[in-house]
Amino acid sequence: MAKAWNVPGLLQDATFRDAAGRVVVTRWREMMSFRDGTLAGEDIEQLHAMRVSSRRLRAAMDAFAGAFPGKSFRTHLRVIKEITDTLGAARDLDVAVDGLEAVVRDFADIERPGIEALVAEYRTHRAAEATHIAALFTRLDEAHFGQRFERWVARHTGVDPGGLQTQPEDH
C-alpha cells in the first residue's frame, strides 16, 4: 500500500483552516498521482493505491468539514465519494480474480472449469469497471473539477495550493 504523503508546511500551531487547506490539497494530489497508472490498467496496485488515497481524502474532508460551507462541502464530498465507490467496484473484482487464480490449482480438475469461467466473468465485469473509471475521469476533466476543487479549498482556507510543494515521501 502506498504511504501517505507528508503535508508540507503543516505546523503544530497551524490554524484549523490552514491545516484543512494543506491536508485536503495534499490528499487530493496524492490520490490523483495514481490516476495515470489506474487508467493504464497494467498494475492493479495503482488502482489500489488510488482507492486508499481517496479514502484518506474522504477522512481528511470529514475531519475538516467545519472549515467549509455545508452545501458546497457536501457537493465536493459527493464527487470524492463517487471516485472512491467507482474505484472500489473495480478493486473488489481485482481481489476476487487474484484470489481465485491463486487457488485454482488447488482444486480438482473437474472443478477448475467452473472457477476459470467465474474468473472470465469477473474479468469481463472488470473491463466494464475500467470503462466507468475512464468515463468518470473524463467527466471530471471536462468540468475542470481538479482546478475547481483546489480553488474551492483555497477560497475557504486561505491556503494557496500553488505554493504547496506536495510529493510522495520518497522524493
Show the residue positions of the predicted features.
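Cationic, histidine-enriched alpha-helical/coil surfaces that engage anionic ligands
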Residues: 1-171
